[in-house]
Amino acid sequence: MPEFRMIDCGGAKLRCVIEGSGPLVVMVHGFPESWYSWRHQIGQIAASGFTACAIDVRGYGGSDKPFAVEAYTLEAIAADLIGLADVLSPGEPAVLIGHDWGAPIVWNTAFTNPDRIRAVAGLSVPFAGAPQRPFTEVFREH
């Protein structure tokens, strides 16, 4: 049976649903979802010999909801995932799985912390590679 925990990741407290033991697998939901979108995968991942951890990203569900817009950068959210891994799997690399908006979150986390990530998967979103320039510039052009 999964366990609900609030994990202090350093910059925010995240609500996590955790089941199993073994290498850490963190599941990151999309927009506008929550840990609940992973409810069918948690048990299967745990039964396969992993610690399955589905989170509410900061600003969602039971996790902290900072008021300042600046608190929602990809860097801050990636730091949450690394902080979570430091608590649940200290010194061991984690597997990250992201769906929808969770995909760029896990990709960014892997790009910026390659030594902390064992594997990464993005679901339902095509991988376009590392950004060559800020997305805001691209948006202004169109």
Predicted regions and their residues:
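Conserved HGGG/HGGXW glycine-rich cap/lid loop of the alpha/beta-hydrolase fold
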Residues: 15-64
